[in-house]
Amino acid sequence: MRLFKNWAKTFGENTDINPNSEMLVSNFKNFLSEQNNPESIDLSSFEFHDELDQDFWNQPDDKLDPEIREKLLVIANDFWSSLEVGDAEYDDITFTGSLAAHNYSRFSDVDLHILVDFSDVDDKTDLVREYFNAMKSVWNRLHDILIKGYEVEIYVQDVNDPHEAQGLYSVLNNEWIKKPVLDKQDF
């Protein structure tokens, strides 16, 4: 998503670009080198925090902020209603990733997972996975949703797939599935 947003800045608004042009190739190489230059990365924001991000987890027992929870539910339900999944229903909506743990940074995003039994959608679960991946890619590209300055990224996960995470929060049930524990040796 971030690379997509930087495209116009690098290549301009011209939609009549010849993909074989030397200018395009040269600009693209420059673009990639800027995006992947290790010296240009500020690592100072990658640090351990003694507490969770208080913009999100400011309630007793580190519960999710009620306004943020409501926004995440609206986002997930809006996405879900845009899909063609028949009578299939999701099992849970979860918040995971670095913002649900102690290793968040200014580069974090809100990882919003919708858990579904893919076989409830269709017996061809590989096709279901491809469909969900395509739809979430389009959705994430078309919707520039920020919460507290962090980009919201939707992902549809099969309930039968294992999910490794330091922190995993059920937005639907408003409770921790796996509350993160600060252990600096994990990083």
Each model region followed by its residue ranges:
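Catalytic core of pol beta-like nucleotidyltransferases
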Residues: 37-108, 115-187
